[in-house]
Amino acid sequence: MALDIHAHRILILDFGSQYTQLIARRVREIGVYCELHPFDMDDEAIREFNPRGIILAGGPESVHEANSPRAPQAVFDLNVPVLGICYGMQTMAEQMGGKVEGSDLREFGYARVDVVGKSRLLDGIEDHVDDDGVLGLDVWMSHGDKVTQMPGNFNILASTPSCPIAGMYDDVRGYYGVQFHPEVTHTKQGGRILSRFVQDICGCEALWTASNIVEDAIAQVRAQVGSANVLLGLSGGVDSSVVAALLHRAIGDQLTCVFVDNGLLRLHEGDQVMAMFKENMGVKVIRADAEKQFLDNLEGEADPEKKRKIIGRTFIDVFDAEASKLENIQFLAQGTIYPDVIESAGAKSGKAHVIKSHHNVGGLPEEMNLKLVEPLRELFKDEVRKIGLELGLPYDMVYRHPFPGPGLGVRILGEVKKEYADILRRADHIFIEELRKADWYHKTSQAFVVFQPVKSVGVVGDGRRYAWVVALRAVETVDFMTARWAHLPYELLETVSGRIINEIDGISRVTYDVSSKPPATIEWE
């Protein structure tokens, strides 16, 4: 009998915290499957999900305000362990008969909590022990309200001078609340605390591993597809590359990939994609050389959003034309990942604060009457990378920096021309090559060159040169929501600048972008 890697599962209810997806990623890192659902998930759906434990996440609301979110009653009727984090602790306390009040003393950022009670959750977990034998934890706080009265049968778990009930517990029922955030790295023992809850208290085994996920995904694909043929748009990005490798292992020649070369890729990228998948792995890949079509459609357009739409529409036209030449295709594969699923669900329910618009292949599934195959839809990005390595993809491919869907089209400011793209490709290649040589590539989260359609005077030998300006951009970030410009060594910047100006005819000046996000975005367009 096949192993059910979803059997031991945790339910996470989202009350709107910026950290909620981080909780899910931390639980997955422990090796346990979990799903993220809105706080108002109906009772029947919760019972059907049949979790071994439930985590109530944080949120921006105040429990004592009218119409603030509450946990469904099923959470407390299932007789499974519950962990409330920040707002989750507050609503648990209030719903079970305790009291929550606002406070003039808000806690945001680093704090030290004293471990007061003897609970299963924190037993043996500490960062400090003071002279009186009191255990302490270094944690991350982000709250204004606080629990001032616990429900019956609860004991104090942790406290700070301004928040006497910074944690509470009922070991008999397995109910726990912490005012701090164990999911963020600033809470040093956060991983151990979550592992204690998920594995020891909820009894979940670590079944959610890369090798198990691959085996399960292959079985699911084979069961869904059978002997039918599958079409995949291969971009060379991480998600589509992992989908291609996974589907090829699952169904072999039933998979056909279409690689659209739009003329806006990095240097030699098209050849590298073909070499990796067609020549080395034996995947059926059709290469559509559509550079002229993309550049013709972009001619004269300088507006960034309009450029994106033109590139998106042209991709669909080219992909559609290639797909229509194929016979007996019943399925379309896409690299949808779990954050996309969460955002789509949020959009439908109206609860999501920020919605990204994704264009994969537009309305193609409906037009061609194709059914969707989405083998990565349960996975976060970091899990997709681990799966890629498990499938044998090279580390440098799996951990390459993000590249925008419109490619160099949004790294060329203003109108896109072939001359600009060719210059930018070479400059970008030099920058990345030198970052790798200096062991800085994986220290940065994203690095690239931007082409600026302005000319500057330079001197070459005894002559004057009037040529283009490019900007180097390198950032460090954890989540791409905020980012800091990378403090690259001056010697490295000097080497990159020297090579670009000397080796590329057409560039006279190199600048370095020292803007952080916010206020700037990572990409220039």
Curated annotation (Swiss-Prot):
Q: Recall the GO molecular function terms of this protein's record.
A: ATP binding; GMP synthase activity
Q: Does the keyword Calcium apply?
A: no
Q: Which top EC class is named for this enzyme in its record?
A: ligase
Domain (Glutamine amidotransferase type-1) ranges: 9-207
User: Pfam families from the entry?
Assistant: GATase, GMP_synt_C, NAD_synthase
Location of the active site: C86, H181, E183
For this protein, the Enzyme Commission number is 6.3.5.2
- Keywords of this protein's UniProt record, alphabetized? ATP-binding, Glutamine amidotransferase, GMP biosynthesis, Ligase, Nucleotide-binding, Purine biosynthesis
The GMPS ATP-PPase domain is annotated at 208-400
Q: In which pathway does it act?
A: Purine metabolism; GMP biosynthesis; GMP from XMP (L-Gln route): step 1/1
Q: Name one GO cellular component term.
A: cytosol
Which reactions does this protein catalyse? XMP + L-glutamine + ATP + H2O = GMP + L-glutamate + AMP + diphosphate + 2 H(+)
Q: Which InterPro entries match?
A: Class_I_gatase-like, GATASE, GMP_synth_C, GMP_synth_GATase, GMP_synthase, GMPS_ATP_PPase_dom, NAD/GMP_synthase, Rossmann-like_a/b/a_fold
Q: List residues binding ATP.
A: S235, G236, G237, V238, D239, S240, S241
The entry's function note states: Catalyzes the synthesis of GMP from XMP.
Q: What's the subunit arrangement here?
A: Homodimer.
**The name this protein goes by in its record:** GMP synthase [glutamine-hydrolyzing]
Origin organism is Pseudomonas putida (strain ATCC 47054 / DSM 6125 / CFBP 8728 / NCIMB 11950 / KT2440)
